[in-house]
From Swiss-Prot:
Pfam families given in the database record: YbaB_DNA_bd
Subunit structure: Homodimer.
Family: Belongs to the YbaB/EbfC family.
Name of the protein this chain belongs to: Nucleoid-associated protein SGR_3378
Subcellular location, record wording: Cytoplasm, Nucleoid
Entry keyword set: Cytoplasm, DNA-binding
Length: 114
């Protein structure tokens, strides 16, 4: 028979799980508030996304606008947004990675990108 019926260990596990859940929620809120940038064309096109990947701003230098070649501009926009999203994913790894390790890896946990 386990002294105390094993209750203290279960209570401790529940408290740890609640703390991890709170830490995860706080990290996700911080990611949603944090903005990261990406650029393309040597800075002619800049995109800003939140740490959770939401596009917030797009700045296009007038030098990048050629009415005869809108395809290149579109490519630069896509590249800038992709670069910003890659930076957001790196930030997610930085902020959420330690929490996922505390949960035994992020595998299968909704909201974790790894």
């Amino acid at each position: 028979m386990i002294p105390g019926g094993g209750q203290p260990n279960m209570q401790q596990l529940l408290q740890q799980a609640q703390k991890m859940q709170q830490d995860l929620a706080a990290a996700q809120e911080e990611l949603a508030r944090t903005e990261v940038d990406g650029q393309a064309g040597g800075g002619l096109v800049k995109a800003t996304v939140t740490g959770s990947g939401e596009l917030r701003a797009l700045v296009i230098d007038p030098k990048a606008v050629d009415p005869e070649d809108t395809e290149t501009l579109a490519d630069l926009v896509v590249a800038a947004v992709q670069a910003a999203n890659e930076n957001a994913q790196a930030l997610q790894q930085e902020k959420l990675g330690p929490l996922a390790q505390g949960l035994g890896g992020g595998g299968g946990i909704p909201g974790l990108p790894f």
